[in-house]
C-alpha cells in the first residue's frame, strides 16, 4: 500500500488559487415592513426610494401599488388577498410600474385587470407588456373624427351619430338599457369583422366594473351566441373584487386597446360603468386618508376620468391611422344629470346619449331622449346617405313631443296638427328596436326615407315594426340594385328613390294588419277638403246673418 504524502506547497497553492478567484456575492435591496393592513390598504414603513405607482411585493406573491408617499410611511393599494398580510411582513420593491400583457391572443377571452385569464380556457401567450398608465396621444398625433362607427341602432346612427375615435357618453338611470345599447354596437361590428378588411374590422373591449358575476356571464353568453366573442375581449372586475381592481379595470382595457390602436387597427371600448369606478376610487382615497371634496370624492376624480377618456383618439396617418372609440356608461339617480360625476364626464366626452326611465316604461326602447342627446363631432362622420334622409328627423320628433304635450290638454286640434301627431307616433314606433337586433345602415336609410315619403302614414301604429320587416323582405327581392347602390351609406340617387317608393306602394295594399284587414290603396281623406271648407263658411255666414 502506497503511503499518502501531503505536500504543504500544494495545499498552499490550492488555497491561493481559490481565494484569488473567489468573489463575495453581496446584494443590496430596500426592504419595508407592513405597519397595518385592512380594507385592501396596507401602510408600509421604509422603502425611501419607492416611486409613485410602483409595484411592491408582499409575502405569498401578493402585489400592491404605491399610492401615498408620506415622510414615514407608504399607503399601498393591495391587489389580491390582503387578509393574509400581517404586521411585520417584509415588503420589497420591484422597480416596475403596473403593466399588463397584450396581444391578439386576448380576443375571445375573459381576463381580470391584471391580464390574467379567468374563463377557464387556459393560459394566454402575450406578444408584449404595456404600461397601464400610458400617456394619451398628443394633439399633433391626432386627426379629426371623420369615419363612422355604426351602432346598428336607428335612433343613434340617424340623430346622434358616432365616429371612430370619438368619446360618446351613454347616460341614464339603472335598468334603462345602457348596457344593451353598447352590446348591440358590438354585435353590429360582426359584418365588418367577417369582411377581413383591416380598415373595416373593429376589435371590441368590454370592461365590466362592479357588475354582478351573473351579468358578466350573461354578456359573454350573448356575444358568443351571436358570434361576436371572437373579436371581443372582456375585462372583468366584478362586484366581489376589491376596490383596487375596480379602479384599475378601465386602465387595463385602455392599455389593451391602445396596443391595437398603435398597430393601425380600429378599437371600440366600453366602460360599464365609470360611476362604480369613481365610487371605488373614492373608497380607496378615503381609506388612504386623502381629503374629501364634493360628495366625498377626492379632488382628482376629474383627472381620473379625463386621463382615461383622452386615450381614445383617431390617430394621424403618420401614426398608422388607428382609432379607439370609447363608450363610457354613467348611471344617474332619478335622471339627475347635474350630479358631480355625470357633469364631469359630460364635460370630458364628445356628446351623450341620454336614456330616460319614463320612455323605457312607456315601451320606447331604446329609451333615447332625442332632445337631450347630442353628438358634438359625430356629424362629420355620419354617412352622406344617412345625413340626407335623416336631416329633418330630429326636428320632426321634437315638434311631435311638443305637440303631444299640448294635445293632452287641448280638446280639438286642427288637421295639420293631427297629421303631425299621427306621423310622430309612427316615427317613434319605427325607431324602436328589439335587443340584440342591430340593423345595417342600408336598411336604416330605407326605413327613414320611406317614412319621410309618407309610406308608413297609413299603417296602424301597432303594426309599424312588422310592416317594416315585411317591407324590407319585399324590397330585397324587388329592388336589390338599390341596396347595392347605397352599400355602406352612399346617398340615394333619384332613380333609387323612385324605385323604392314604387316598390313600397306596390307592397302596401297586400299588407295584412293585426285586425285582419288589408291596407287600402286610397289616400286618407283630408278632413278639411274644399267642400267641407265651403260648408263651414256657409254655416258661419248664416249664423252671422241671424
Swiss-Prot record:
PROSITE patterns assigned: ATPASE_ALPHA_BETA (PS00152)
Predominant subcellular localization, coarse grouping: membrane
Localization, UniProt: Cell membrane
Assigned EC number: 7.1.2.2
GO molecular function annotation: ADP binding; ATP binding; proton-transporting ATP synthase activity, rotational mechanism
Domain of life: Bacteria
Site (Required for activity): residue numbering on this chain: 373
Membrane topology: Peripheral membrane protein
Residues annotated as binding ATP: 172-179
Record's keyword terms, sorted: ATP synthesis, ATP-binding, Cell membrane, CF(1), Hydrogen ion transport, Ion transport, Membrane, Nucleotide-binding, Translocase, Transport
InterPro entries membership: ATP_synth_asu-like_sf (IPR023366), ATP_synth_asu_C (IPR000793), ATP_synth_asu_C_sf (IPR038376), ATP_synth_F1_a_nt-bd_dom (IPR033732), ATP_synth_F1_asu (IPR005294), ATPase_a/bsu_AS (IPR020003), ATPase_F1/V1/A1_a/bsu_N (IPR004100), ATPase_F1/V1/A1_a/bsu_N_sf (IPR036121)
Gene Ontology terms: cellular component: plasma membrane; proton-transporting ATP synthase complex
Region annotation (Disordered) ranges: 511-546
Residue ranges, compositional bias (Polar residues): 511-520, 536-546
Pfam assignment, any one: ATP-synt_ab
Reaction catalysis annotation: ATP + H2O + 4 H(+)(in) = ADP + phosphate + 5 H(+)(out)
Family: Belongs to the ATPase alpha/beta chains family.
Oligomer and partners: F-type ATPases have 2 components, CF(1) - the catalytic core - and CF(0) - the membrane proton channel. CF(1) has five subunits: alpha(3), beta(3), gamma(1), delta(1), epsilon(1). CF(0) has three main subunits: a(1), b(2) and c(9-12). The alpha and beta chains form an alternating ring which encloses part of the gamma chain. CF(1) is attached to CF(0) by a central stalk formed by the gamma and epsilon chains, while a peripheral stalk is formed by the delta and b chains.
Functional note: Produces ATP from ADP in the presence of a proton gradient across the membrane. The alpha chain is a regulatory subunit.
Protein name as catalogued: ATP synthase subunit alpha
Organism whose genome encodes this protein: Corynebacterium aurimucosum (strain ATCC 700975 / DSM 44827 / CIP 107346 / CN-1) (Corynebacterium nigricans)
Gene: atpA
Amino acid at each position: 500500500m502506497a503511503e499518502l504524502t501531503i505536500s504543504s506547497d500544494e495545499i498552499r497553492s490550492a488555497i491561493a488559487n481559490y481565494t484569488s478567484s473567489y468573489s463575495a456575492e453581496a446584494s443590496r435591496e430596500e426592504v419595508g415592513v407592513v405597519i397595518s393592513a385592512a380594507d385592501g390598504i396596507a401602510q408600509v414603513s421604509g422603502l425611501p426610494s419607492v416611486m409613485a405607482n410602483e409595484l411592491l411585493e408582499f409575502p405569498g406573491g401578493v402585489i400592491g401599488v404605491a399610492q401615498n408617499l408620506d415622510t414615514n410611511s407608504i399607503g399601498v393599494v393591495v391587489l389580491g388577498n390582503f387578509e393574509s398580510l400581517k404586521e411585520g411582513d417584509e415588503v420589497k420593491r420591484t422597480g416596475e410600474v403596473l403593466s399588463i400583457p397584450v396581444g391578439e391572443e386576448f380576443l375571445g377571452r375573459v381576463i381580470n385587470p391584471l391580464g390574467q385569464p379567468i374563463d377557464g380556457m387556459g393560459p394566454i401567450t402575450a406578444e408584449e407588456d404595456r404600461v397601464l398608465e400610458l400617456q394619451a396621444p398628443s394633439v399633433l398625433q391626432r386627426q379629426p373624427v371623420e369615419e363612422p362607427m355604426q351602432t346598428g341602432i336607428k335612433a343613434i346612427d340617424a340623430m346622434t351619430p358616432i365616429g371612430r375615435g370619438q368619446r360618446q357618453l351613454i347616460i341614464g338611470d339603472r335598468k334603462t338599457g345602457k348596457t344593451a345599447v353598447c352590446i348591440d354596437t358590438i354585435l353590429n361590428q360582426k359584418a365588418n369583422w367577417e369582411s377581413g378588411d383591416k380598415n373595416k374590422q373593429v376589435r371590441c373591449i368590454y370592461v365590466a366594473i362592479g357588475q354582478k358575476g351573473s351579468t358578466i356571464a350573461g354578456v359573454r353568453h350573448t356575444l358568443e351566441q351571436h358570434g361576436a366573442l371572437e373579436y371581443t375581449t372582456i375585462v372583468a372586475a366584478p362586484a366581489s373584487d376589491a376596490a383596487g381592481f375596480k379602479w384599475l379595470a378601465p386602465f387595463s382595457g385602455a392599455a389593451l386597446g391602445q396596443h391595437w390602436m398603435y398597430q393601425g387597427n380600429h378599437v371600440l371600448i366600453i366602460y360599464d360603468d365609470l360611476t362604480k369606478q369613481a365610487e371605488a376610487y373614492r373608497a380607496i382615497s378615503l381609506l388612504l386618508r386623502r381629503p374629501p371634496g364634493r360628495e366625498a370624492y377626492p379632488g382628482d376624480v376629474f383627472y381620473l376620468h379625463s386621463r382615461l377618456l383622452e386615450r381614445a383618439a383617431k390617430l394621424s396617418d403618420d401614426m398608422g391611422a388607428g382609432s379607439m372609440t370609447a363608450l363610457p356608461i354613467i348611471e344617474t339617480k332619478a335622471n339627475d344629470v347635474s350630479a358631480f360625476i355625470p357633469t364631469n364626464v359630460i364635460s370630458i366626452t364628445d356628446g351623450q346619449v341620454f336614456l330616460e326611465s319614463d320612455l323605457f316604461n312607456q315601451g320606447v326602447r331604446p329609451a333615447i331622449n332625442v332632445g337631450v342627446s347630442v353628438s358634438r363631432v359625430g356629424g362629420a362622420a355620419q354617412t352622406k346617405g344617412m345625413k340626407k334622409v335623416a336631416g329633418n328627423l330630429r326636428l320632426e320628433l321634437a315638434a311631435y313631443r311638443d305637440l303631444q304635450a299640448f294635445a293632452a290638454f287641448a280638446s280639438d286640434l286642427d288637421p295639420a296638427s293631427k297629421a303631425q301627431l299621427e306621423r310622430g307616433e309612427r316615427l317613434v314606433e319605427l325607431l324602436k328596436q328589439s335587443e340584440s337586433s342591430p340593423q345595417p345602415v342600408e336598411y336604416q336609410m330605407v326605413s327613414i326615407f320611406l317614412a319621410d315619403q309618407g309610406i308608413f302614414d297609413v299603417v296602424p301604429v301597432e303594426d309599424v315594426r312588422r310592416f317594416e320587416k315585411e317591407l324590407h323582405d319585399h324590397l330585397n327581392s324587388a329592388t336589390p340594385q338599390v341596396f347595392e347602390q347605397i352599400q355602406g351609406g352612399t346617398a340615394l340617387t333619384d332613380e333609387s328613390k323612385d324605385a323604392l317608393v314604387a316598390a313600397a306602394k306596390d307592397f302596401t295594399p297586400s299588407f295584412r294588419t293585426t285586425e285582419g284587414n288589408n291596407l287600402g290603396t286610397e289616400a286618407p281623406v283630408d278632413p278639411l277638403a274644399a267642400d267641407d271648407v265651403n260648408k263651414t263658411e256657409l254655416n258661419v255666414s248664416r249664423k252671422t246673418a241671424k
